[in-house]
């Protein structure tokens, strides 16, 4: 993911948590915050230390990033997203993870995602 599409700072994460809307399924919680003046979307990832070891957590983050790269044309611009992975993600394949991520994005009101 490009640098302009990432949320890295703690205060940016906190703003999305406090002011944004959340949607969830068994595998993910997605917080969404509208930012009209922003020309692109931004994504922040969070995988708890309760989920596996570092290898498993990094694998989950890589799969989420790859899914976002494939869906980038369908994700609404002008929004910040924070994606929190839950425990069931540790046993999922890439296809299952991507399908679950699409499901939770659709629940959050993104109409352009068709896959």
Curated annotation (Swiss-Prot):
Q: Which Gene Ontology BP annotations are present?
A: tRNA 5'-leader removal
What are the protein's UniProt keywords? Endonuclease, Hydrolase, Nuclease, RNA-binding, tRNA processing
Work out whether the entry's keyword set contains tRNA processing. yes
What are the EC numbers? 3.1.26.5
In terms of InterPro entries, this protein maps to: Ribosomal_Su5_D2-typ_SF (IPR020568), Ribsml_uS5_D2-typ_fold_subgr (IPR014721), RNase_P (IPR000100), RNase_P_CS (IPR020539)
The intrachain disulfides are none
- HAMAP family (alphabetical): RNase_P
Record's family? Belongs to the RnpA family.
- The protein in question is named Ribonuclease P protein component
Annotated organism of origin: Bacillus mycoides (strain KBAB4) (Bacillus weihenstephanensis)
